[in-house]
């Protein structure tokens, strides 16, 4: 059944209501403005672009997981008609590897550049799919044919795939530097005392296997040079300001000579973020040859070369008192980064180590994370990176604890979740150099309300009745906590034109989350105009000199905060000008329907009329700036930590190992909802991906490092047919005090606890004493357990 949502977002008297004479746009279900161009096929993607005279780039990728490059023979490829150049590391060696220090990661990881990704492989390859050679030709088919003529001789080396084995030293991927890029320690409290005084100590190992976002649209980039000005125009990247900064430095260009331009990039989910080596090769080639370069990856390339995610091992230990209250938690984590560090991923290891304890009262905590390298595709961020994996481990060991000490899953959570009296919770560790600060809320209260809203007790009773009738039906849950708003600033600008339009510029980017719609609502409320009169400009470094971008559920709070700040500055300037033009006291002016009105009179002037009156000559005569515009930088004091619970009821088919999710509910404390429609959409989309990671998706490898899952024939994705109805229960009881909206990030909520809740429900359905400790759960595993082929084990 197609995923849909039950409307369980409270109105609170705001949505669509007027506050006095002011129109409240925040809280309304405004339709996404992005959807029309996407649904009608009028949106422009990088793959749609065609620049006269462009060459097409094809990458020759490694066929070996670990090998020395003995020789490269491109003679036949270079002879092919239509081929303009064959690029190897001899051309790009001087560029080095994709820079990481430019993003500040060296503050977390010492010597991080030792492990960054080469532009093209130099002397050796570390994974199947690594770029080795680039072929440029006049059309993509010639480029592909010529690429197949490139002959590369390899000397195979021992292959390393297991993250725990990476620390044994049997195989070194980086000779003299080992396979551990970093070791991260996070701790607070007296962990030794906690375990010494514990009545119950529970230990278990949990594994989340490798999968990723696999968006419909693969990566693509177009680079157009302007040789006269030594300038590059680049389309097709997510984080435009990071790409500009890094590509400019690698090519030894001033940043102003690299101009990132907006184009639709489709779904990202984190996996398209950062700077990829192919982008650098395309930029270098365009500048070197003075002609446009276009590159689009195919699906096999995407599955083997675009960032993977999720592969972690958690060796978790839990200390409890006699009543089942948590005394302490220890975790040793092995994070499989694949062959190199990529842009986003160094942050994920740090976040993971600092967030395993979740929204619980944990007096003592000690986590050590090993960021290790293997001969697999490098990993990157994927929706709720670090949170999905750590939540699975934590919630699963809590279920194990419930079985050992005789508590229900719900009662154990109630005894240990944070309450209003516990907050703010600042235990004394940092996440990415920011002190962990759980600012507001009441997790226990929300937990109880979410269970009641879903009628969870009925789920439990129904499942018992159905099991008594011989059906394999079970119920599971997982409590979640997200970390949102990473990256402490964002830029924005608002300009009112005389033509009756408002332009909002933002350093954020559109990756499918509806940022254009939400920013229009935020600015509309401050200017008191309709959102449809507002245009949003983003992802263009010529128009927006600086910015951070959209990731880590930060757009509403940070991009929205910057847009609101700029809008307020416009309102204040307009109020001053209106008071002069209407000869009225500023305090007697009220802004409604886009116009300043003098209270008690019919005198008024619109924002557009004020903008028109501030032409350069008039403004100069008044010693004022022309126009009606303002730019702003919004600085956030801290990240925010939304929380919630995911509930699942599942039925298993013992004869096939198949499964059907009967009910799925996810809740969150939102602080404040800007647009209920986009909120539900984000929760549903994330839930679908969480179900995929729990039951369907996995990148598999042969023992020699050859990838098995290289197409959608092998890599399973849930379709609409497999999706349950998704109920969303969203409360607005705990506004975050650290941002002007009181909002918390919501883009990743639906995915975080999906794996944990589904695993919990599967164990409940089978009730064989076996503890699910690995994702995804396959039909083969379910069949085996239902047929009694597994012995109970922990």
Curated annotation (Swiss-Prot):
Pfam families: Ald_Xan_dh_C, MoCoBD_1, MoCoBD_2. Keywords: Metal-binding, Molybdenum, Oxidoreductase, Plasmid. One of its GO terms (molecular function) is 6-hydroxypseudooxynicotine dehydrogenase activity. The keyword Metal-binding applies. One of its GO terms (biological process) is nicotine catabolic process. InterPro entries: Ald_Oxase/Xan_DH_a/b, Ald_Oxase/Xan_DH_a/b_sf, Ald_Oxase/xanthine_DH-like, AldOxase/xan_DH_MoCoBD1, AldOxase/xan_DH_MoCoBD2, AldOxase/xan_DH_Mopterin-bd_sf. Binds 1 Mo-molybdopterin cytosine dinucleotide (Mo-MCD) per subunit. Its cofactor is Mo-molybdopterin cytosine dinucleotide. It is an enzyme of class 1 (oxidoreductase). Pathway: Alkaloid degradation; nicotine degradation. It catalyses: 6-hydroxypseudooxynicotine + A + H2O = 2,6-dihydroxypseudooxynicotine + AH2. Its EC number is 1.5.99.14. Molybdo-flavoprotein enzyme complex involved in nicotine degradation. The subunit gamma (large subunit) contains the substrate-binding sites, the subunit alpha (medium subunit) binds FAD and the subunit beta (small subunit) has a 2Fe-2S ferredoxin-type domain which binds 2 2Fe-2S clusters. Heterohexamer of 2 alpha (kdhA), 2 beta (kdhB) and 2 gamma (kdhC) subunit. Dimer of heterotrimers. This is 6-hydroxypseudooxynicotine dehydrogenase complex subunit gamma. It comes from Paenarthrobacter nicotinovorans. The lineage of its organism: Bacteria, Bacillati, Actinomycetota, Actinomycetes, Micrococcales. The gene is kdhC.
């Amino acid at each position: 059944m197609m995923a849909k949502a039950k409307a369980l977002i409270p109105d609170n008297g705001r949505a669509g209501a007027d506050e006095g004479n002011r129109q409240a746009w925040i809280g309304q279900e405004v339709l996404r403005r992005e959807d029309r161009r996407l649904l009608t096929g009028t949106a422009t993607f990088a793959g749609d672009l065609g620049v006269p005279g462009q060459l097409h780039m094809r990458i020759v990728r490694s066929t070996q997981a670990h090998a020395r490059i003995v020789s490269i023979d491109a003679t036949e490829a270079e002879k092919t008609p239509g081929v303009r150049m064959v690029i190897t590391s001899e051309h790009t060696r001087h560029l080095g590897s994709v820079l990481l220090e430019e993003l500040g990661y060296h503050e977390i990881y010492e010597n991080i550049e030792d492990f960054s990704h080469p532009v093209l492989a130099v002397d050796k390859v570390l994974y199947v799919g690594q770029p080795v050679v680039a072929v440029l030709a006049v059309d993509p088919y010639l480029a592909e044919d010529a690429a197949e003529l490139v002959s590369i001789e390899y000397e195979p080396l021992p292959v390393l795939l297991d993250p725990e084995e990476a620390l044994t030293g049997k195989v070194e991927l980086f000779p003299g530097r080992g396979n551990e890029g970093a070791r991260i320690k996070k701790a607070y409290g007296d962990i030794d005392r906690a375990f010494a005084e514990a009545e119950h100590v529970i230990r278990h190992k949990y594994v989340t296997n490798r999968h990723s976002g696999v968006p419909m649209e693969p990566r693509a980039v177009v680079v157009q040079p302007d040789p006269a000005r030594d300038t590059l125009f680049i389309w097709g990247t997510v984080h435009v300001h990071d790409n500009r900064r890094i590509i400019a430095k690698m090519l030894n260009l001033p940043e102003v000579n690299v101009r990132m331009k907006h184009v639709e990039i489709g779904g990202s989910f984190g996996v398209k973020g950062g700077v990829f080596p192919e982008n650098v090769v395309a930029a270098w080639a365009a500048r070197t040859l003075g002609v446009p370069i276009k590159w689009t990856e195919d699906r096999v390339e995407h599955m083997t070369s675009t960032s993977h995610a999720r592969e972690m091992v958690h060796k978790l230990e839990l200390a409890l008192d006699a009543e089942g209250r948590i005394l302490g938690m220890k975790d040793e984590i092995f994070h499989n980064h694949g062959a190199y560090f990529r842009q986003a991923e160094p942050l994920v290891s740090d976040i993971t180590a600092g967030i395993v304890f979740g929204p619980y009262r944990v007096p003592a905590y000690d986590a050590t994370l090993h960021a290790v390298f293997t001969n697999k595709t490098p990993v990157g961020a994927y929706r709720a990176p670090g949170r999905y994996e750590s939540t699975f481990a934590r919630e699963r060991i809590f279920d194990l604890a419930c079985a050992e000490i005789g508590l229900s899953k719900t009662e154990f959570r109630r005894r240990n979740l944070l309450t209003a009296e516990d907050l703010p919770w600042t235990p004394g560790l940092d996440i990415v150099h920011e002190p962990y600060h759980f600012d507001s809320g009441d997790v226990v209260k929300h937990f109880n309300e979410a269970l009641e809203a879903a009628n969870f007790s009925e789920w439990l009773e129904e499942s018992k009745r159905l099991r008594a009738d011989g059906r394999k039906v079970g119920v599971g849950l997982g409590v979640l906590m997200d970390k949102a708003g990473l990256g402490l600033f964002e830029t924005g600008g608002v300009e009112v034109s005389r033509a009756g339009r408002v332009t909002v510029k933002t350093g954020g980017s559109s990756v499918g989350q509806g940022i254009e719609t939400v920013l229009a609502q935020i600015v509309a409320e401050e200017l008191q105009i309709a959102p449809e009169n507002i245009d949003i400009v983003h992802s263009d470094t010529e128009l927006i000199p600086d910015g951070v971008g959209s990731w880590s559920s930060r757009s509403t709070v940070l991009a929205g905060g910057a847009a609101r700040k700029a809008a307020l500055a416009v309102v204040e300037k307009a109020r001053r000008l209106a008071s002069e033009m209407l000869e009225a006291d500023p305090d007697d002016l009220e802004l409604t329907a886009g116009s300043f009105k003098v209270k008690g009179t019919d005198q008024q002037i619109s924002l557009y009329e004020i903008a028109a009156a501030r032409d350069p000559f008039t403004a100069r005569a008044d010693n004022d700036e022309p126009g009606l515009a303002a730019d702003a930088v919004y600085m956030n004091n801290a990240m925010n930590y939304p929380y919630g619970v995911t509930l699942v009821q599942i039925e298993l088919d013992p004869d096939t190992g198949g499964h059907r999710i009967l009910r799925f509910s996810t809740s969150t404390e939102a602080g404040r909802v800007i647009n209920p429609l986009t909120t539900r959409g984000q929760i549903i989309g994330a839930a679908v991906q969480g179900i995929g990671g729990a039951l369907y998706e996995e990148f598999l490898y042969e023992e020699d490092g050859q990838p098995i899952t290289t197409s959608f024939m092998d890599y399973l994705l849930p379709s609409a047919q497999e999706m349950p109805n998704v109920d969303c229960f969203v409360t607005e009881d705990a506004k975050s005090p650290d941002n002007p909206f009181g909002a918390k990030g919501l883009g990743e909520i639906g995915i975080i606890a999906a794996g944990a809740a589904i695993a919990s429900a599967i164990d409940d359905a089978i009730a064989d004493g076996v503890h699910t400790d690995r994702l995804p759960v396959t039909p083969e595993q379910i069949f085996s357990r239902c047929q009694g082929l597994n012995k109970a084990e922990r």
